[in-house]
Structures are given as structure tokens and as C-alpha cells.
Amino acid sequence: MSETLRIEIDVDRALAILRELSPASMQAAWRRTLRKTHVWIKGQVAKAVSKETKIPQKVLRSRVYFFLKSYDSGKVWLGLNAVEAERLGDPRQTKTGVTAGRFRFQSAWLMKRIAPNGPVYRRAGKARLPYERVKYDWADAGEAAFRNIAELAEQRLLTILEQEVNYEIQKAIGNAK
């Protein structure tokens, strides 16, 4: 499932405030704003998806990336590929399969001799071979959470920008800490 989600945020109102500062101050405030907004989006997406799917936030945060394309634009990327079962928690062999974290995978097994905490496998057909690695698909829940957070991102961006502009103004008049 590879779909591009494009979010347009109108920042003209915010940039009007920044035009009152020097170009270097304006650029510094905007870059900090983009970076802090990315950190906020990363945390919120991880929190929302983790709450819905029970996948650990640590695993989800490693799948959110931010690219600063130019001085005035950035791109947030969320990897929606299925998560390997062994990344969901410490895999344990049970009578009926494997348990990893809060998830149970029926008819799955670990290769204890090769890698005790390694990949979890399941037969791909009725025969002995082939077998495949077990993965947990979370794309639908992840995309829905990302869309919800994207709707809130513009307001958060403006809030952070206001704080950063205030910091630059305080720095210019000598009151910054």
C-alpha cells in the first residue's frame, strides 16, 4: 500500500509576522519551528497509532522521518510497511505459536538454535517449505492516525512559530535566556 498523502498548510499569516525580523532571525525561527513541529508530529503519530494498534511507540517513531527540503519547507514521511513480529516485543514460543509483545501469532515458530530472539516464521503453504517471516500489518490504522494528526499540524505549527518569533524578538532586545 503505497499512497502519497499531501498536506498543504497556509503559512502566509505566519510569514507576515516573520517579515518584521531580520532575514537571518526569520530563517532561524522558521527552521526551529519546522524541526519542533516534526518532533511533535512524530510523537503524536506514535502515540495515536500505538494506542490503536498496541505497537510500541519506540518501533513507530523509527518509521517517521522529516526532510528539510529548503529553508521554508519540510516533508514528513511515515513508513507504513508491515512490522516484523520480533520487533513488537520479546518473542516467546508457546504451544500454539509465538507471542511477541501483546500479539499472538498462531502456527508460528522461532528458530531457537540459530537466533533465539530472531525472526518469527510461519509456513506459506501446506508443505514443509516454503516458509515466510511473520509480519503485522498496521497500514490502515497508521494512515488514519497520520491524517488526524496532519489536520492538527497547521495549528501546532502556528503556535510554535509564534513562540519562536517571540524568542527572536526577545533575543533582539536582549531579554532572551
Name each model-derived stretch.
Residues 1-177:
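Short, Lys/Arg-rich flexible segments
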